[in-house]
Amino acid sequence: MVKLGNNFSEKSTKQPLLEDGFDTIPLITPLDVNQLQFPPPDKVVVKTKTEYEPDRKKGKFRTPKIAEFTISITEGVSERFKVTVLVLFALAFLTCVVFLVVYKVYKYDHTCPEGFVFKNNQCIPAGLENYYSEQDSNARGKFYTVINHYNLAKQTITRSVSPWMTVLSEEKLSEQETEAAEKSA
């Protein structure tokens, strides 16, 4: 508890009295409003624009107006032209995106159809795999190797793809033999 009525400015040398049950710490006295506010000035000086003009003429740096440096490329251009240019830029952007997607699909799609093998970034027939791997990285050599061995690879592929091909070819041979036997008889 705090005992009312004491002041900071009064320093007591007495022993605190414990009989009334209060401590001897004094309360802070309220502040006077006059102590917080400064007195209002007698004169208020307000500079107008005409009073600032002599400062510019004295050689002080003046900030340039922003309007002096603005350049408008659309001034005098019709709205139709602006929309046309905007549409052309949008089409050019979309074309670039489409080409990028097509390139990525072409470059990174490594799935080959059945009967083909992916080798050296190309899908080659399974029958040409041995001949293709023997060639060096010369593209012209690869091309000629594929052309030279095309017939052999075609036969290899057809035999490996269908087991019925041998049966059909044997039937044709037997038919030819019977026809030849009938003609000779």
Curated annotation (Swiss-Prot):
InterPro entries: NSG (IPR009431). Residues 1-82 are cytoplasmic. One of its GO terms (cellular component) is multivesicular body membrane. Pfam families: Calcyon. Its main location: membrane. It is found in: Membrane; Golgi apparatus, trans-Golgi network membrane; Endosome membrane; Cell projection, Dendrite. Plays a role in the recycling mechanism in neurons of multiple receptors and acts at the level of early endosomes to promote sorting of receptors toward a recycling pathway. This is Neuronal vesicle trafficking-associated protein 1. It comes from Gallus gallus (Chicken). The gene is NSG1.
